[in-house]
């Protein structure tokens, strides 16, 4: 018999095989004809009529019609994180990453470039030396050596691995972004993908729900359809977040790259936990999660921004995509008690710059913008886009009006 196979990237090919052969034999034929790198047997999943084909079952048992096709989904093996040992010569380029971070951590990372190696050369004083290590670079940190030193005392040692991954240059950065976003679909490709997955035997509502839960990753959407969309199990783990992640009470604009840059150092020192767990305690990540849940199509732009500002974090995300998506799917926490207080203070002193309310779940976050930024947002709104979407796109594109306009025009605004 001749089996027609189709990938989620619309590649179609045919394999001749005896119906008495098993599914595993078909996988081995696919690997031999298409290459071990692209179609490894261990990573293949064959799907027909909404069911995963079992390796030990004969092909004739599934009654595969030669006029129909079998979907081939290849899952990449989970990469092993090796970013921790790369801690040699950190003083080359840590300052650019530290400068791009938010003011709360910029003051903490400012002393990191010069004493990055001296604290590691004197490990005799571990816990007590945290204050002395932060008091030595007092000229770089200027004032406030006491209170900031209590929270970011870890950062001088933590920033060392960051430049190790950023040294290869822009090519590696773009490769990371392509790897993280290659499987995401938007615009017309989204509709094509919905139709394609529906041809496997699923209802449109199921397909759209799975794509939304996977943030338009078709491979993972098919997994969710087959295995079930994950619930809110991981949200129970966020019961008592550590208090050290409280930056400043003032609301910050949702520039996700800055949020990512502030947390670069923490990625390599989450002892015993998942490399991405530290994001849960970052107010910027909670803001990012809220934005993405409202509009999943913004995810590629946000990943691109993270790749520019923080390639190490993007690498961690690409290596743990499933965990990252589960974290994004968690319900947004009502953190309005602390952030709301800071926002109220900013609103009370209004009259200088403009204030724009960002849509939230149950509360409003006010973002302070300059008159020029407000004019740019009004111009984007004049194109016919809703204000909430315009604000998200404008800040996601680093306040680049032209880029935000192009991004908005490329999106599909059909209500699910």
Curated annotation (Swiss-Prot):
The modification Phosphoserine is found at residues 160, 174, 199. Disruption phenotype: Impaired embryonic development with a 90 % rate of intrauterine or neonatal death. Surviving animals display a variety of abnormalities, including retarded growth, facial dysmorphology and male sterility. The effect on NER competence is reported conflictingly: According PubMed:11809813 no change in NER activity is found and according PubMed:15336624 a reduced NER activity is seen. Embryonic lethal with Rad23a and Rad23b double deficiency. Double deficient cells show reduced cell survival upopn UV radiation and reduced steady-state level of Xpc indicating a reduced NER capacity. Disulfide bonds: none annotated. Residues 274-317 form the STI1 domain. The modification Phosphothreonine is found at residues 155, 186. It comes from the Eukaryota. Keywords: Cytoplasm, DNA damage, DNA repair, Nucleus, Phosphoprotein, Proteasome, Repeat, Ubl conjugation pathway. Belongs to the RAD23 family. This is UV excision repair protein RAD23 homolog B. It comes from Mus musculus.
């Amino acid at each position: 018999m001749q089996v027609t196979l189709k990938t989620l990237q619309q590649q179609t090919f045919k394999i001749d095989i005896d119906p008495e052969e098993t599914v595993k034999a078909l996988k081995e034929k696919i690997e031999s004809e298409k290459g071990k790198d692209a179609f490894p047997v261990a990573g293949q999943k064959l799907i027909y009529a909404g069911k995963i084909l079992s390796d030990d079952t004969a092909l004739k048992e599934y009654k595969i019609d030669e006029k129909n096709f079998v979907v081939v989904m290849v899952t990449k093996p989970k990469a092993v994180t090796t970013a921790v040992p790369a801690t040699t010569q950190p003083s080359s380029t840590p300052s650019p990453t530290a400068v791009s971070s938010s003011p709360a951590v910029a003051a903490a990372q400012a002393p990191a470039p010069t004493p990055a190696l001296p604290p590691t050369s004197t490990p005799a004083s571990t816990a007590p030396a945290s204050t002395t290590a932060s008091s030595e670079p007092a000229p770089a940190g200027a004032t406030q050596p006491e209170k900031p030193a209590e929270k970011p005392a870890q950062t001088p040692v933590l920033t060392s691995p960051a430049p190790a991954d950023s040294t290869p240059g822009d090519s590696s950065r773009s490769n990371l972004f392509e790897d993280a976003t290659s499987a995401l679909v938007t615009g017309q490709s989204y509709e094509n993908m919905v139709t394609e997955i529906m041809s496997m035997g699923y209802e449109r509502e199921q397909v759209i729900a799975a794509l939304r839960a996977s943030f338009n990753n078709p491979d993972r959407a098919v997994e969710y359809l087959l295995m079930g969309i994950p619930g809110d199990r991981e949200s129970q783990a966020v019961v008592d977040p550590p208090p050290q992640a409280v930056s400043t009470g003032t609301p910050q604009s949702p520039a996700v790259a800055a949020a990512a840059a502030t947390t670069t150092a923490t990625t390599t020192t989450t002892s015993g936990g998942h490399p991405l767990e530290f994001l849960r305690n970052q107010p910027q990540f909670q803001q990012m999660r809220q934005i993405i849940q409202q509009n999943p199509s913004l995810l590629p732009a946000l990943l691109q921004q993270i790749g520019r500002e923080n390639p190490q974090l993007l690498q961690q995300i690409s290596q743990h995509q499933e965990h990252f998506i589960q974290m994004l799917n968690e319900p947004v926490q009502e953190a309005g008690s602390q952030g709301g207080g800071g926002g109220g203070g900013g609103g009370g002193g209004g009259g200088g710059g403009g204030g724009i309310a960002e849509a939230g779940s149950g509360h409003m976050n006010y973002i302070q913008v300059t008159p020029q930024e407000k004019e740019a947002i009004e111009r984007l709104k004049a194109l016919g886009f809703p204000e909430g979407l315009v604000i998200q796109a404008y800040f996601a594109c680093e306040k680049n009006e032209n880029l935000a306009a192009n991004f908005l025009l490329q999106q599909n605004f059909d209500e699910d």
